[in-house]
Curated annotation (Swiss-Prot):
Belongs to the mitochondrion-specific ribosomal protein mS35 family. It is found in: Mitochondrion. PANTHER family: MITOCHONDRIAL 28S RIBOSOMAL PROTEIN S28, SMALL RIBOSOMAL SUBUNIT PROTEIN MS35. Residues 27-62 are annotated as: Disordered. This is Small ribosomal subunit protein mS35. The gene is MRPS35. One of its GO terms (cellular component) is cytosol. The keyword Magnesium does not apply. Signal peptide: none annotated. It comes from the Eukaryota. GO terms for biological process: mitochondrial translation. Component of the mitochondrial ribosome small subunit (28S) which comprises a 12S rRNA and about 30 distinct proteins. GO terms for molecular function: structural constituent of ribosome. The keyword GTP-binding does not apply.
Amino acid sequence: MAAPSLPAWLALQTRARTLRAFSTAVSPVTGAQRLSPPTTERTSKHERAPRRKALPPRTEKMSVDQDWPSVYPVAAPFKPSAVPLPVRMGYPVKRGVPMAKEGNLELLKIPNFLHLTPVAIKKHCEALKDFCTEWPAALDSDEKCEKHFPIEIDTADYISSGPSIRNPKARVVTLRVKLSSLNLDDHAKKKLIKLVGDRYCKSTDVLTIKTDRCPLKRQNYDYAMYLLTVLYHESWKTEEWEKKKTEADMEEYVWKDSASEKNILETLFQIKAAEKNTELSKEELLSTKEVEDYKNSVVSLKNEGDNENTISQYKESVKRLLHLM
C-alpha cells in the first residue's frame, strides 16, 4: 500500500511549492507604500459630521428699493424668509405676544395678497395695455350688449385657506343664453326645451348649461359651447315619429287648426246662418274680440290646468261669445 501512494505525495508537494511561490510574488505592498486615508474620513462610525453653517435669511439681504414683483410675481403661500415684515399671528400664550412668522403655520393657512401690490398691478396694466382696445361706442346700453353678445359665460376664482392656491371649483363654467336670441322656429324651440329639461327657465326665457366634467376651465368652456351647438342643430331636425304626433302628444296646447277652433267656427256659422248673416268670413270671425277672449281662455285652461281662475275665464268668455250676458 505504501508504494502506490508515493507518486501522489510527490505531486502534492510540487503543487504546494508552486502556490507558495505565487503567493510570494503577489504579496501586498508594505505599510510604507500604502496610500494614506483622507483627512476628512471619520475616525469613528459614531462620530457625526460637522453641521453646515446656516445662511442668513433673504430678508436681511434685501434692499429698500428692490423690485418687489420679482419676489412675489404670482399668488403663493406665505414665505417668512422672503417677507421683510415683522408679521405675527396666533393665540398669545400667557399674555404674551403672538408667534413670530418663522415656522408659523397660521400664516400658511390664510390667503395673502403680497403679489397684488399697487406697483405690481400697475405693471400688469401697462403690459396688457398693448393688447386691449377701447370699448365700442355703439354698445352704450345693456340691451345692445345682449343683442350683439347673447351668450353669457360665468366663471369663478377662489382663494383657499391653505398652502395650495388651487381650488377644484374654479374649473366650473356656466353658460347662459336666451332662446329668443337664437334663430329657432316654433318646432325647434319646443324640441330644444324638451331636450334640456329643467335647465330652461320659462319665466326668464334663459337656458343655463353648467359644465364641470373636465379638469381645466378652458376644457369646460369648450364643452359648454359644444353642447349648445349640438342642441341647436338637433332641435332643427324633424324625425319621422314627430310627423305622427297628435294633439294629445303636443308639449302645449295650440289653438290653430285645433278641434276647439273648428267647433267654435262651426257654431258661429250656424248662428250667423240662423240670423241670415253670411257675409263674415272665417278670418273675420277669428279676429273678433269675443273669439280672441275665448281662444285665450281655452289655451290657458289646457296649458295651466283646471283652477278657479282659468275656469272662471272660460265661463265668462263663453257667455260673451254666445251673447248670454
